[in-house]
């Protein structure tokens, strides 16, 4: 059968490296390494899973060429000493056996390092931090610059000896080479600063040294921030100009964008469309006639195919998409596109856990980032009936997982449609990508002949008993938190009133005009939900005020979403009232107490209560009582356990495997 995506599966040769298809796993930190900078075996398995899934080229996350000075993470890989060769060799061996090629990204963090981690003041081109509020770095002396140049060359030779097929030099994203290239962070007045040629000199020396060390047949990739997307930073036109100073020895440009201060474009926010950056790769390719990788929220294989067919890029780079589904390439090649578990670009488990919390990466849609779908190889050893109450993403994960290992599974959902809160929130235009996850889960459930779904059905004790359960999973989700505040319960979500929760707002979403210029919106609650409401109305021209009891709007958000929402609030002039508490609700105003203890009125045309969600357990206590004297185990998961994020519900749904094992079914 002819493949629908011929350009994706066309091999390509770069010097002596032939890549079997055009999908590149782009480098993205994981925190899976050992604390001494060595590859862990978990780490090796992570990359092998993606090679096994059909990926053509894997570019391993950035490895420090000069530790500790050049390291930016507690578990960052190192390639600055021969000690690290054995595990890196094992990595290459593990990837190669599946027919994939492998490169490693070489990096020096510069000012993106932290003194608390490296034990010294970070260094850079100048004494300018890599982001607002960052540490002030120490400008490098010329002899130090030349020392680092040599360290790049030594690291590249070491990579070649490990068995890597290529190296990538990181010259973007606010790391050291980027700090020299950017006029924001390079204020030098010597031969390494000032003009574009001078700012590109460090990159040129690094690339030339790497070529000298690896020889004429070894591919060199360079990752760039083609547009820094910050005031005073390099534009695409600026980048096209400075590339001429070092493009000669570069084989492939990995065309990214953004800096630390514009991280929502570097690690794409979820509203940015598939392939939105491809024009940047096209511009570089056209000017320098070099193969280019394009990146940027590419999840849909048709978008990837169209980019390649149109000549905008030669490779499709995917990072988070392959965290979400290591089998993406195989599923596309063998006609199983509907089975792809698409990344929803929430940035919670990857960027949030790694950058924000310094933890190993996780994934909202993939509860088994390392083990993939291996769990399906084991089936229950005796009959087991599992009843799941609630068809949101947590309940769907539990039901599908139980059915996939052979349980007879019953899913009871009181509404007409499955998907829960994720499906509801995805109706907000900027959140539409979120729908990919419940849609995938619903498709997954539809293929399981031992999973029986009852929609429009409220679970009762008698119904559950009739299904003869061995295990009951309660996943009944959450409802908005509505505290006992004067006027709130009389007005919120009532017909004819102007006060609503986010759920009622979404129900009325088509009633709000596109042009709301001059209308006032007041939002109580500055968390993720309140910010979703803010974005919806500011983009329609409304004047928005946000009220938050805590000292900061967006507390607990991942760094990408935080940066993005801060930029939007600044752009649209959102009034932020922090340390401010709601006292009373009226139909046209909120009465609040400000930080000084004074009472203020906030008038509005539309007011929204976004104080988070609380667990909803309408039948759990009855179920507990009815089965209290039996061997039936009852587990409560997702928001009905405690209102949190989708990621916790997905993981708890997959944990049905542990429940089955505890009862000797597995």
Q: At which residue positions do the language-model features occur?
A:
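Short acidic active-site motifs
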Residues: 303, 459-463, 645
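Beta1-alpha1 glycine-rich phosphate/pyrophosphate-binding loop at the start
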Residues: 388-452, 456, 481, 526-560, ...
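A Rossmann-like FAD-binding core segment of flavoenzymes
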Residues: 435-481, 490, 495-519, 539-625
